[in-house]
Swiss-Prot record:
Protein source organism: Buchnera aphidicola subsp. Acyrthosiphon pisum (strain APS) (Acyrthosiphon pisum symbiotic bacterium)
Gene symbol of the encoding locus: glyQ
Listed name of the protein: Glycine--tRNA ligase alpha subunit
Record's subunit section: Tetramer of two alpha and two beta subunits.
Reaction(s) catalysed (UniProt annotation): tRNA(Gly) + glycine + ATP = glycyl-tRNA(Gly) + AMP + diphosphate
Top-level class of the enzyme under EC nomenclature: ligase
GO molecular function: ATP binding; glycine-tRNA ligase activity
Keywords tagged on the record: Aminoacyl-tRNA synthetase, ATP-binding, Cytoplasm, Ligase, Nucleotide-binding, Protein biosynthesis
InterPro entries for the chain: aa-tRNA-synth_II/BPL/LPL, Gly-tRNA-synth_heterodimer, Gly-tRNA_ligase_asu
Pfam short name (any one): tRNA-synt_2e
Predominant place of localization: cytoplasm
């Protein structure tokens, strides 16, 4: 029995299966409010140092300032990305990516697919990269980036990050002009739409982000998360993963303050630098930790390679 057709759920499963076949481990989304898939610890920590990584995962993302009370057909404060991170990147990674679009019935021979230069930067993560936006018929659907620096550290080797904008791709696949009309899933001709699931949340979260969040409460939360992160970083045996989570929570609070326009331009820059200082400290200590362990994933890759050579 065919239970689903051209829907949002199907889009996710196609990408998961495709990248699994390309050798990626499929991870689960980080269970914290973050602004992009890049903030997931699999990407942030995985791109530090020489150890290889092949990972893919869906990530729910929040950008409070982008909320439009559930009234804008393509602007959301909560949305989904599908993230792929590979280190070192294969030489034919762009073709591998284009093949994934083909599985989504997006054929470059039929549609106008362009790689438009757009170097990427994330100041709070101390990260930047050389990259492109991928446009489908004039609409951005993917960010394609070769990381040069993460946590203020030079990437050796570089990692490639591919970030699919799932809502935009789904709108193309389903020929919808309003994100809330997207079919999320269907079973026996019963359809659940994106709006059925998320439109009320967009209304309420937008009200909170722009009107009802307590600014003093947010300032206090930021300070407490910052202090907690510092404490965990500076332990004799630092809790780096936990500290990074506290930094992400502080970062979300910063985004809420930004949505409320509670920060002057100078204050905003100061908060960015405070977050960046913490992520840099985590990155440096994490690199040293992995180094002291002998970068074990490097050895694991060599062991797998040696076994494959013996079999062949």
């Amino acid at each position: 029995m065919k239970n689903y057709h051209n829907n949002f759920h199907k889009l996710i499963t196609i990408l998961q299966e495709y990248w699994l076949q390309q050798g990626c481990t499929i991870f689960q989304p980080l269970d914290l409010p973050i602004g992009a898939g890049t903030f997931h610890n699999i990407t942030f920590l995985g791109t530090i140092g020489p150890e290889p990584i092949n990972a893919a995962y869906i990530q729910s993302c929040r950008r409070p300032s982008d909320g439009r009370y559930g009234e804008n057909p393509n602007r959301l404060q909560h949305y989904y990305q599908f993230q792929v991170i590979i280190k070192p990147p294969p030489n034919n990674i762009q073709n591998i990516y284009l093949n994934s679009l083909y599985l989504l019935n997006i054929d470059e021979k039929i549609h106008d697919i362009r790689f438009v230069e757009d170097n990427w930067e994330n100041p709070t993560l101390g990260a930047w990269g050389i990259g492109w936006e991928v446009w489908l018929n004039g609409m951005e659907i993917t960010q394609f980036t070769y990381f040069q620096q993460v946590g203020g550290l030079e990437c050796k080797p570089v990692s490639v990050e591919i970030t699919y904008g799932l809502e935009r791709i789904a709108m193309h696949m389903q020929n919808k002009s309003n994100v809330y009309d997207l079919i999320w899933n269907e079973y026996n001709h019963k359809k659940i739409t994106y709006g059925d699931i998320f439109q009320q949340n967009e209304r309420e979260q937008s009200q909170y982000n722009f009107q009802y969040s307590d600014v003093n409460f947010l300032f206090d939360c930021f300070k407490k998360y910052e202090l907690e992160a510092k404490k965990l970083i500076n332990l004799k045996e630092p809790l780096l993963l936990v500290s990074y989570e506290k930094i992400l929570q502080a970062n979300h609070i910063f985004n809420l303050l930004d949505a409320r326009k509670s920060l002057s331009s100078n204050e905003r820059q100061s908060y960015i630098l405070r977050i960046r200082k913490l992520t840099s400290q985590v990155a440096i200590k994490y690199l040293n930790l992995r180094k002291n362990l002998g970068f074990p994933l490097c050895h694991k890759k060599r062991e797998i390679h040696d076994k494959e050579n013996i079999i062949n």
